[in-house]
A protein has these predicted regions:
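Divalent metal-dependent catalytic cores for phosphoryl transfer on phosphate-bearing substrates
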Residues: 7-8, 19-132
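All-alpha helical catalytic cores of prenyl diphosphate-utilizing isoprenoid enzymes
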Residues: 1-11
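Regulatory/sensor and coupling segments of signal-transduction and defense proteins
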Residues: 14
Length: 135
């Protein structure tokens, strides 16, 4: 729905703000917040919005150049010398069968791979609950 991505990003930032005091020794605050802001940046190109109706649909043109919004965000961050943020974006879906470029089921991944996935998942799960409450 129109505004859903902004709401989701805002929720992710709020979760990060709440979690950071517990995690501050394990993760850089700027990197955490940047990853929360950028993890779905490719969605602004992956989907089209009809601003009159608010209807959102998949942009078929996106597939010509990109595999997914995660790939777009990963590439954007790698191009701008931000590999840690890129890796957080690559793993934010958690599992390869859910669209993650890096599967969190792999062994010996660094801690920061997991945090944006869990933040994103919380926002997505609670967002669905609240939207269903509106119906």
């Amino acid at each position: 729905y129109l505004g859903g991505l902004i709401q989701h990003i805002s929720e992710c930032i709020e979760y990060a703000r709440a979690i950071y005091p517990v995690m501050y020794k394990k993760i850089n605050k700027d990197i955490l917040f940047a990853a929360c802001i950028l993890h779905d940046i490719g969605k602004i190109f992956e989907y089209k919005i009809d601003f009159e109706t608010g209807f959102v649909e998949y942009n078929e043109e996106f597939k010509k150049d990109w595999i997914s919004h995660s790939q777009y965000g990963f590439t954007l961050c790698m191009t701008n010398n931000q590999p840690q943020i890129a890796k957080m974006i690559a793993s934010h879906h958690g599992r390869a069968d859910w669209g993650a470029m890096v599967d969190l089921g792999e062994k010996d991944l660094e801690n920061y791979y997991y945090i944006v996935h869990h933040i994103d998942d919380l926002s997505a799960k609670f967002g669905k609950i609240f939207i269903s409450d509106l119906k």
